[in-house]
């Protein structure tokens, strides 16, 4: 009985890891283009699987994600129009470029905010002495 429970736990762990890896792959527009060109998005069972994977948006699961933009892509994949557009390599390229721009600006903005916060803390420390 304990062996069966351990085996079930192991199967759940493996399934969790596989689904985590797959969901994170959805952050890659070139992979989405690959799936679209091979007709995966026309398969109703695959589209249903994408709907099932929306549970990753729950904070209980989302905390394990390294690439949070995969959740946005997963949400967009719920729309047939978006899935159809992904067949076009130019669409995937555009998404890829937009992601790069987002991260470039996000990094700069974050650095500026951190510098401003550090300066403010430094001023607070000197004024309280």
UniProtKB/Swiss-Prot annotation:
Subcellular localization, per the record?
A: Nucleus
One of the record's GO cellular component terms: core mediator complex
Q: Which InterPro entries match?
A: Med31_sf, Mediator_Med31
Q: How does it assemble?
A: Component of the Mediator complex.
One of this protein's GO BP terms?
regulation of transcription by RNA polymerase II
Q: Which family does it belong to?
A: Belongs to the Mediator complex subunit 31 family.
Q: Which residues cross the membrane?
A: none
* Protein's name according to its UniProt entry: Mediator of RNA polymerase II transcription subunit 31-B
Q: What does this protein do?
A: Component of the Mediator complex, a coactivator involved in the regulated transcription of nearly all RNA polymerase II-dependent genes. Mediator functions as a bridge to convey information from gene-specific regulatory proteins to the basal RNA polymerase II transcription machinery. Mediator is recruited to promoters by direct interactions with regulatory proteins and serves as a scaffold for the assembly of a functional preinitiation complex with RNA polymerase II and the general transcription factors.
Q: Point out the coiled-coil segments of this chain.
A: none
Instruction: Tell me one GO molecular function of this protein.
Output: transcription coregulator activity
Q: Which UniProt keywords apply?
A: Activator, Nucleus, Transcription, Transcription regulation
